[in-house]
């Protein structure tokens, strides 16, 4: 079976590095990705995709990327089932990043 995803878009907020109780670095961020099509007379729509990165990838993202940065993410899709505080069953979908890279100019990325 294959579970591979690649997205490219802009970060919607600054990533914030966290550390698990066992000392593993993790960062969660969201990427706005424009859809490939646009209906006549309408604005282009975007999808907002949640991404999680671990260890060195998390540290790299938190150090070099900010809100508005263009980013390319390679990884896999992961789903989680959970019950919210009101007792409703929910499902979340996210990309778990295995690789990230710059997509904008040096001036745009701030490096």
Predicted regions, residues:
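Single-stranded nucleic acid-binding surfaces, predominantly the OB-fold ssDNA-binding core
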Residues: 1-111
């Amino acid at each position: 079976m294959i579970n591979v995803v690649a997205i490219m878009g802009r970060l919607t907020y600054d990533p914030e590095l966290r550390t698990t109780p066992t000392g593993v670095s993790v960062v969660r961020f969201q990427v706005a990705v424009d859809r490939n099509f646009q209906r006549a007379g309408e604005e282009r729509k975007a999808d907002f995709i949640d991404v999680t990165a671990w260890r060195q990838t998390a540290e790299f993202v938190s150090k070099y990327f900010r809100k508005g940065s263009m980013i390319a993410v390679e990884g896999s899709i992961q789903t989680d089932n959970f019950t919210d505080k009101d007792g409703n069953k929910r499902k979340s979908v996210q990309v778990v990043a295995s690789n990230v890279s710059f997509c904008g100019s040096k001036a745009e990325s701030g490096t």
